[in-house]
A protein has these predicted regions:
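A short, polar/proline- and glycine-enriched secondary-structure boundary/capping micro-motif
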Residues: 109-112, 144-152
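A short hydrophobic beta-strand element
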Residues: 92-107
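Short, surface-exposed coil-to-beta transition loops
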Residues: 83-85, 117-123
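Short, cysteine-centered beta-strand-loop-beta hairpins and adjacent loop/turn segments enriched
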Residues: 77-80, 105-117
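Short, low-complexity N-terminal intrinsically disordered segments enriched in polar/charged residues
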Residues: 2-49, 154-160
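Hydrophobic pocket/interface hotspot
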Residues: 29-32, 42-44, 51, 63, ...
Length: 160
């Protein structure tokens, strides 16, 4: 391929790429949390088809099917989850956006509330490509309701 053709193709690719500013990334991340909380199937419109996901105890997955597989792991136990949008801290950096916050909800008949109970604090690391989410790594303790307390000996008088 000639140099001129290579340059023309590179320019065309660059034109087709959607460059997001920090506010765009924050808007997409907020939309992700709202759609997730509502269980909306159109959440996938925010992701690349080959998007990478990481969730504790699930590990890494790739693509929409992996995202569904991760969500199905909560079937029968997660009654609801609501992220506390006003608690979010956004830290943009290049193609990345880090979102730290809290959630509240109910699982297996027990409630949790981030900042008040052991479970419910999270930190998500999003990577964006071409205007969509290319990866999301979700960092949290999936023991939302504190069922695993016996293995940790810090006592009950902790600040959440």
């Amino acid at each position: 391929m000639s140099t001129a053709v290579s340059i023309a193709l590179a320019k065309e690719r660059k034109t087709n790429e959607m460059v997001l500013n920090d506010q765009d990334k924050i808007r997409i991340a907020r939309e992700y949390f709202m759609r997730a909380d509502q269980g909306r199937p159109d959440i996938f419109e925010l992701f690349h088809d080959d998007a990478e996901i990481y969730f504790p105890k699930f590990g890494f997955g790739f693509g929409r099917e992996s995202f569904l597989e991760m969500v199905k792991g909560f079937e029968g136990s997660l009654e609801y989850i609501q992220h506390d949008y006003d608690s979010f801290t956004f830290i943009p950096s290049g193609d990345y956006l880090i979102v730290e916050g809290t959630s509240h909800g109910r699982m297996c008949g027990k409630s949790w509330a981030g900042g008040k109970t052991p479970g419910g604090r999270f930190c998500n690391v999003f990577k964006f490509r071409d205007g969509r989410i290319a990866s999301v790594h979700i960092h949290l303790d999936p023991d939302y309701t504190g069922e695993d307390e016996a293995r940790f000996r810090w006592g009950k008088n902790r600040h959440w």
